[in-house]
Structures are given as structure tokens and as C-alpha cells.
């Protein structure tokens, strides 16, 4: 019984510690922010922090800016019912 309680508590804690992640999106076009220097990228870090706050992180992944440590309601790519100019 104690082990079941511990497992449940650990799963609840993991759920609250993990933050949302996703591609930075341009709300007017529905497109991801593009980047070309993969990995650590000052441009992506700056754009993610500007849109999502100082606590956000960002780097270039698959030629798009990937933002980390976002709040749960953060809007990331893809936008519902909005395509990236047919791409």
C-alpha cells in the first residue's frame, strides 16, 4: 500500500514539474519561426523569451525555433484551423 502511495505521489510531482514545449509560431501567418544555426541559437532564445517571458528557453531544432519551459496555456505551432500559407 505504501509503495502504491509513493508511486502516485511521484507521478503527480512529475506532472507538475514538466513544462510545455513547442515551436514558436507567428500568429498572423501560422508559420514556425525559421532558424538556420541548429542547436543553441541566440535568435531563438531571444524570440522565445520575448513572446513567453524571461523563464522560457529556446534553441533551433529542425530549422524551427523550439521553445522550452513554457506555461501550460502557451500557444505553439501548429495553430488550430490556420495553415502556414499552404505549406
Curated annotation (Swiss-Prot):
Disulfide bonds join 31-84, 35-60, 44-65, 48-67. The modification Asparagine amide is found at residue 85. SUPFAM superfamilies: Scorpion toxin-like (SSF57095). Expressed by the venom gland. It is found in: Secreted. Keywords: Amidation, Disulfide bond, Ion channel impairing toxin, Neurotoxin, Secreted, Signal, Toxin, Voltage-gated sodium channel impairing toxin. GO terms for molecular function: sodium channel inhibitor activity; toxin activity. It comes from the Eukaryota. Residues 20-85 form the LCN-type CS-alpha/beta domain. Residues 1-19 form the signal peptide. GO terms for biological process: defense response. InterPro entries: LCN-type_CS_alpha_beta_dom, Scorpion_toxin-like, Scorpion_toxin-like_sf, Scorpion_toxinL, Scorpion_toxinL/defensin. One of its GO terms (cellular component) is extracellular region. Coiled coil: none annotated. Beta toxins bind voltage-independently at site-4 of sodium channels (Nav) and shift the voltage of activation toward more negative potentials thereby affecting sodium channel activation and promoting spontaneous and repetitive firing. Is lethal to mice but does not show toxicity to freshwater shrimp and crickets. Belongs to the long (4 C-C) scorpion toxin superfamily. Sodium channel inhibitor family. Beta subfamily. Has the structural arrangement of an alpha-helix connected to antiparallel beta-sheets by disulfide bonds (CS-alpha/beta). Is neutralized by the single-chain antibody fragment 10FG2. This is Beta-toxin Ct1a.
